[in-house]
Amino acid sequence: MLNTEKVKLGICPIGWTNDDMPDLGKENTFEQAVSEMALAGFKGTEVGNKYPKDVNVLKKALDLRNLQIASAWFSSFLTTKPYEETEKEFIAHRDFLHEMGAKVIVVSEQGHSIQGEMDTPICEGKYYFNEEEWKLLADGLNKLGRLAEDKGMKIVYHHHMGTGVQTTDEIDKLMSMTDESLVYLLFDTGHLVYSGENPIAILNKYANRIKHVHLKDIRADVLEKVKKEKMSFLMGVREGSFTVPGDGCIDFEPIFKILDENNYEGWILVEAEQDPAIANPFEYAMKARKYIKEKTGF
């Protein structure tokens, strides 16, 4: 299961050091993170804040470990700022990733987002775009998609807790309003389950537009606590709402099966942000790799 000729397996640095809460994993260096990724059996990673900004320095460090850059997160503000501001930042981001050999660019709209707010309840305080904002978002993403296409790349939209594109209805609306040849979807298991969505339904519906996959699991008891105690997204992360595949409540077997049946081609990355002082990053990377091998033979 899963075509090893077409699928690449990676892991994100957020398990070692958290860009949104830099105190989590502040003791973990870039070199330690990428060395442990390679040692655990992964072939790629996404870019974190501690990664060298110089392309040649980063390439050398990754080449030593036989790792590639799969992508990097880009925050758009298409609903709250002039398009030109986002475009300028996007082009610089695109060009860096292009030099690193990446084929996809992860984009998430952060206008009105509460994901980075420490005190806003993640399950209650979400913003809902109005029609004008939806149009700004869709039009802007189509433009960014063309800019990516200019370099032979694709943008993949990251639905995310606490943002204007979180629920099934919102994902449907975004997909219907954007050009299917310019705007693709990032499929994130953890964010869908966290939001109460059906990841299998999303995967089946958009199999042809999903060009990037994040695997994260959910600790159901912690998620229940987050809801009950009205915690923010970041507080939930500190509590351990997310973990690696095989360590939580999500059944990944049907997900792997559907990806395989639809001839998925691209990166599948473990992305499980939690406190590295509690969940040792190398240990959990090994745990994830073992689980994926057991379920897919990969």
Swiss-Prot record:
Identify the coding gene.
iolE
The domain of life is Bacteria
Q: Name one Pfam family in it.
A: AP_endonuc_2
- Coiled-coil portions: none
Query: Which species?
Result: Clostridium beijerinckii (strain ATCC 51743 / NCIMB 8052)
Which chemical reaction does it catalyze?
A: scyllo-inosose = 3D-3,5/4-trihydroxycyclohexane-1,2-dione + H2O
Pathway the protein contributes to: Polyol metabolism; myo-inositol degradation into acetyl-CoA; acetyl-CoA from myo-inositol: step 2/7
Q: Which cofactor does it need?
A: glutathione; Co(2+); Mn(2+)
Q: GO biological process annotations for this chain's record? A: inositol catabolic process
Sorted UniProt keywords: Cobalt, Lyase, Manganese
> Can you say what this protein is called?
Inosose dehydratase
Q: What is the lineage of its organism?
A: Bacteria, Bacillati, Bacillota, Clostridia, Eubacteriales
Q: Please state the Enzyme Commission number of this protein.
A: 4.2.1.44
Class of the enzyme per the UniProt entry, highest EC level: lyase
Q: Name one GO molecular function term.
A: myo-inosose-2 dehydratase activity
Protein family: Belongs to the IolE/MocC family.
